[in-house]
Amino acid sequence: MSSPPPARKGFYRQEVTKTAWEVRAVYQDLQPVGSGAYGAVCSAVDSRTGNKVAIKKLYRPFQSELFAKRAYRELRLLKHMRHENVIGLLDVFTPDESLDDFTDFYLVMPFMGTDLGKLMKHETLSEDRIQFLVYQMLKGLKYIHAAGVIHRDLKPGNLAVNEDCELKILDFGLARQADSEMTGYVVTRWYRAPEVILNWMRYTQTVDIWSVGCIMAEMITGKILFKGNDHLDQLKEIMKITGTPPPEFVQKLQSAEAKNYMEGLPELEKKDFASVLTNASPQAVNLLERMLVLDAEQRVTAAEALTHPYFESLRDTEDEPKAQKYDDSFDDVDRTLEEWKRVTYKEVLSFKPPRQLGARVPKETAL
């Protein structure tokens, strides 16, 4: 058997959990951090700055058109996002020297240390920390939504947190219907808005606000708010608190099946949120009542939620940069595998890092 060619100049090879990694020599001390449905993550130290970074390697991104399309979208979304509460790219590189050889690329992002799910398992969060974390979630969402992107799968596990309680939203805009077909992974539905779980209608950005409400309630009580065993059980759990919706809401549902189901439900009164959320301040309860509304059209937006009195002590409107619209017209084009490869390779090569690797992006460039 012939041995593999030597690593590209300026790169080195290392095996990490039975996978060959070939990374730029500036990234030292590769340590496995975790792996998911689509890729693995290592921490490393950027030898130029001494900063710890996270490097993600996608599993065989060009194994099919579907995987290639997803990899391309992830790269373009990460390149687009420049906000302190949204994960963005510090670097992207490929060890492959030409388009013909192109099979892998690596995404370099800030290293955050933990996620909100792990944090909640290990400690009870004070009201101040809850307020600061929710404020950052909403700032990140306001920016993502202004870019025209919907997260679709916000949950504690994809909210990265560092030791200073600074939060960044991960994996935005990637949760598409193809996920379970591609990987067999079942998506957690406990944080998903009812209109997403049941495919009621074309959903809007407020699906993410529902998720923030579920996460905020869990931080306050230490318990998952709506823990259904399946789709319909999830809806029952939700309605035990929100009550059954009025007839005018049921009329808006686009699916006849959903309409019939809703009309057949026994009537449930809305619960007083303060009784469910013991220990929560009146302002926190009021904010949650505006987030956890069955009718998505009546739900508060991220921009509106940020003006709520609950955040009065934190709000800094100067600190809410505007986003440029993300152009997703490229993402849904039908392309051959070779074409996906070509456009992805072009995106990798055209990446320009933030002014200083590892530095916070200055406000005037945070567009």
From Swiss-Prot:
Residues 27-311 form the Protein kinase domain. One of its GO terms (molecular function) is MAP kinase activity. SUPFAM superfamilies: Protein kinase-like (PK-like) (SSF56112). Activated by phosphorylation on threonine and tyrosine. MAP2K3/MKK3 and MAP2K6/MKK6 are both essential for the activation of MAPK12 induced by environmental stress, whereas MAP2K6/MKK6 is the major MAPK12 activator in response to TNF-alpha. Its EC number is 2.7.11.24. The keyword Translocase does not apply. Binds 2 magnesium ions. ATP binds at residues 33-41, 56. A motif (TXY) lies at residues 183-185. Highly expressed in skeletal muscle. Also expressed in the heart, particularly in cardiac myocytes, lung, thymus and testes. It catalyses: L-seryl-[protein] + ATP = O-phospho-L-seryl-[protein] + ADP + H(+); L-threonyl-[protein] + ATP = O-phospho-L-threonyl-[protein] + ADP + H(+). It is found in: Cytoplasm; Nucleus; Mitochondrion. The active site is at residue 153. InterPro entries: Kinase-like_dom_sf, MAP_kinase, MAP_kinase_CS, MAPK12, MAPK_p38-like, Prot_kinase_dom, Protein_kinase_ATP_BS. Serine/threonine kinase which acts as an essential component of the MAP kinase signal transduction pathway. MAPK12 is one of the four p38 MAPKs which play an important role in the cascades of cellular responses evoked by extracellular stimuli such as pro-inflammatory cytokines or physical stress leading to direct activation of transcription factors such as ELK1 and ATF2. Accordingly, p38 MAPKs phosphorylate a broad range of proteins and it has been estimated that they may have approximately 200 to 300 substrates each. The modification Phosphotyrosine is found at residue 185. The gene is Mapk12. This is Mitogen-activated protein kinase 12. Monomer. Interacts with the PDZ domain of the syntrophin SNTA1. Interacts with SH3BP5, LIN7C, SCRIB and SYNJ2BP. Interacts with PTPN4; this interaction induces the activation of PTPN4 phosphatase activity. Keywords: ATP-binding, Cell cycle, Cytoplasm, Kinase, Magnesium, Metal-binding, Mitochondrion, Nucleotide-binding, Nucleus, Phosphoprotein, Serine/threonine-protein kinase, Stress response, Transcription, Transcription regulation, Transferase, Ubl conjugation. Dually phosphorylated on Thr-183 and Tyr-185 by MAP2K3/MKK3 and MAP2K6/MKK6, which activates the enzyme. Ubiquitinated. Ubiquitination leads to degradation by the proteasome pathway. The modification Phosphothreonine is found at residue 183. The lineage of its organism: Eukaryota, Metazoa, Chordata, Craniata, Vertebrata. Its main location: cytoplasm. It holds the Pfam family Pkinase. It is an enzyme of class 2 (transferase). It comes from Mus musculus (Mouse).
